[in-house]
Amino acid sequence: MHTIRCLILSALSVAGAAQAQGSQDAAPAGRQPVGSVASPGLEMPGLRLSPGLRVRKLTEDQMPAFMEADDMSGEPSAELLLKGNAQVRRVDGVIKGDSIHYDDATSEVEVKGNARILRDATLVTGPSARINLNTYSGDIDKPNFWIGASGGTARAEHADIFSRSQMRLTDVYYSGCPCEKPSWYIKATSLDLDVDENEGVARNGVLYFKDVPILASPYLTFPIRKERKSGFLLPTYGTSSKTGLDISVPYYFNLAPNYDATLISRYMGKRGLQLGGDFRYLGYSYAGSVSGTYLPNDRDAGFDRYMYRLTHKQYLGSGFYTDWDISGVSDDNYYRDMTTLGLNTASTTYLPRQGRVGWSSNYWQTYVQVYKYRTLQDPDAPIVPPYDKEPEIFLQGARYDWNGFDVRMDSTAVRFRRPLFLGNRIGQEGERLEAYPTIAYPIVRAGWYFTPKAGLNYTQYHTSWFNQDWNRLGSLAPYRGTESRTLPIVSLDTGMTFERPTTLFGKDSTQTLEPRLYYLRVPYRNQSALPVYDTSLADFSFEQAFQENIYTGGWDRIANANQLTVGLTTRWLDASTGFQRVALSAAQRLYFEDQRVTLPGETPRENVRSDFLVGASAALTDTLTTDLAAQYNPYDNNWSRGLVSARWTPQRQTTLALAYRYQRDPISNISYAPRGQNQVTLAFQWPFTQRWYGVGRVDYAIRSDTGGVVGASDSARVTQAIAGLEYKGDCCWTGRVVFQRYAVAANDANTAVFFQLELTGLGALGTDPLKLLDKSIPGYQPVSQPTPAGTTFERYE
């Protein structure tokens, strides 16, 4: 038996070819203007492109059809009957069957026996089918679908195809699960699929999991591909000691490619029905969002609760830009009572209200901003609110490598205002003007550098002192309305790097030795009469040891200094890859004069040497890493602070992390000094079997901060506990249950339970704990891997 092949060209395509040939014959090449019919942008003297070869998109009725069968009868220009391994093939699809009847006048194809239609990687099979090649409309009896773009499958009693992208299935079974035996599926009386709109609409649909119905809806929508679409998202649910039963039903609006919105109805068993939403937008030069919630008459609190936040960033052109971040809540306890499941927003203490307009160029940048705070007070641990900046003006000019010099100037002008604290005015108010020009001359060579630097800091204050300040600070005489300070600051920074080949753990390595010296000279100026707005004592660390001031913030205090910082670092690097295996560091300051400048209540330093700083990090193996950072007091032989951590990751989705943090109590009880801390943290993700995984984290405060921080307590307590199980089913689903308990105030905690059923190809039912696990467990990896999106090249015949 011989296979017969036939090519059918439409009348229009044949006429077009004839017209092109006629044009070619009528215009000899020698008389045709050069490039007159060439494609745009193509000019080659002496050559031209024949109109018959010009590339243009064919319409549906111009596409040629290729036919093949064991037996073929009829007229190609009228009707053809193909029998035995029959197929009709065009560039946009293939139709196969036992027999095919083709009508050239209407482009109708009728398939009988083992109908098989393939287009854009979507395959449809059935006992019979009718299809129009031009409109791609028709119908199929008892079809089976394999949707290439999503990997989904479907079967139905009947399918009506309306166009290339739209069809309706009757009495349908659908699943987006790529497994051979899907674990979940949807049954519906009808299912409308719109590929262009990326939407599937099931009517009278029931979602089954393991053949058990778990969700029913008269109207259910879902995406066909992994793209955005408008419609209801899967509901989230959980339980919390603050909200009770917590159910959220979001509706997503895919308004445009560059902006969208989500409307969320949230029911809380203890509080009532809350309405929330957010709107996001993104443009070529701007981006922002608007979000908020409203709960009328909270059943537990007895009044209305709300939250809002507006963010925006925009480039205005010519170097100008603007941004703002404005947020607010109805009351101080909003986040403690209404925290979203999986997101510990209960620790939110300050809400920013900031707006800024700025400009920048190659060497200059400036901005004007208003920066205010809403302080959310914990009645069991009240804190003094920070100063508002109303406004702040910043100007910076910088030129680097300017004939070898680095020149920079920073200046600010700020007006400070402080909100009332417990109905009282705490602290002074006023304006501060600061200018700090510096010049440096870096000398950098292979293996060493030397950088001298000099600057002059000028600060002026206009202060309004109040009776509360006079009573607290003492005599009125030293505190004038206007004060100024001028201080020269000089430093020398130098370092070297030595290298040598060596071995580490039997492997070739390169060891470096990196000594560093930093000398700082700042003369003494009496600053006791200056106010303190936004300055605090900086933590002593490797970074701070090589800084110009022991205070951080706005430099309301600049400490006198005649000191030398000595640092030494050594590293072991893999000789072939450069990967750092081990690093050891140490540093100490040597003081040549006593400290005379202090913050109010601070005890001045009299020691001639600082604490020792030591640090170490090691990748002992490819799976085990350790880190250590500590501060040791050589005078009383005690540790001032320390952090020791280790992480073991023997394989994918397996990690164990352990950390210990220690902070010694400050010598004096001053508000700006960090409180003592003694805390152990254990976090893990561990497979119990091939399918069962355990996750967890415990933060245990042996003795924690009592300085007014949210969740603080002087007694031992568990500040956070997370425990959960993950079950990795087949390729279709993953189940999770996670328990979380965390501090929301000094004497209060919240308990939450998360349930989630993740269905591949559909979405997830329940509250998503993945953000919580990713943030809380170092090295966490989801047990369910994302399924890559299908393409039009997924299947070819």
UniProtKB/Swiss-Prot annotation:
Compartment(s): Cell outer membrane
BP GO annotations: Gram-negative-bacterium-type cell outer membrane assembly; lipopolysaccharide transport
Region ranges (Disordered): 23-45
Pfam families tied to this protein: LptD
Top-level taxon of the source organism: Bacteria
GO CC annotation: cell outer membrane; transporter complex
Signal peptide: 1-20
Family the entry assigns: Belongs to the LptD family.
Role, per record: Together with LptE, is involved in the assembly of lipopolysaccharide (LPS) at the surface of the outer membrane.
HAMAP family named in the record: LPS_assembly_LptD
PANTHER family on file: LPS-ASSEMBLY PROTEIN, LPS-ASSEMBLY PROTEIN LPTD
This protein's name: LPS-assembly protein LptD
Upper classification of the organism: Bacteria, Pseudomonadati, Pseudomonadota, Betaproteobacteria, Burkholderiales
Gene from which this protein is expressed: lptD
